[in-house]
Amino acid sequence: MLNNKTILVTGGTGSFGKCFTKYVLDHYDVKKIIIYSRDEFKQWSMENEFRILYPEKVSKLRFFIGDVRDLDRFKRACQGVDYIIHAAALKQVPACEYNPNEAIKTNINGAMNIIEAALDCNVKKVVALSTDKAVNPVNLYGGTKLVSDKLFIAAI
């Protein structure tokens, strides 16, 4: 399914993004994996780690600095992409509680940007990660992820 495909991973330098990228490189012969994140240092660190772990495959990785809150930048990253794995989120419960505007911008507006870019760029499939905290949410993180889930479902 993923052989010879281009995959974009939002939050690609996070714990899920790194594990997913390793799994894909271990099991598929992808055309390209775009690691999309806003943290330049984490991208640099991940690239160096993957040069050691996957010296013959690191050329398939592209490190794209950007934020899911920036629709124009994200659309640029989506050119030629077959699949998006959306793992970017503001996910620490206390950080969301103390920074509600940032949580909404990233987790809800970011989801809307993923959907719009995927539709505009003819992306074949989007897989959006969620959390158990979106079921009967009791905090802002759960609430923003519930809204994000509803947006992705409505876009089907």
Roles of regions detected by a PLM:
Residues 37, 64-65, 105:
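Conserved residues in the N-terminal Rossmann fold of short-chain dehydrogenase/reductase
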Residues 83-86, 90-150, 154-156:
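Conserved Rossmann-fold NAD(P)-dependent oxidoreductase catalytic core, especially the SDR/UDP-sugar
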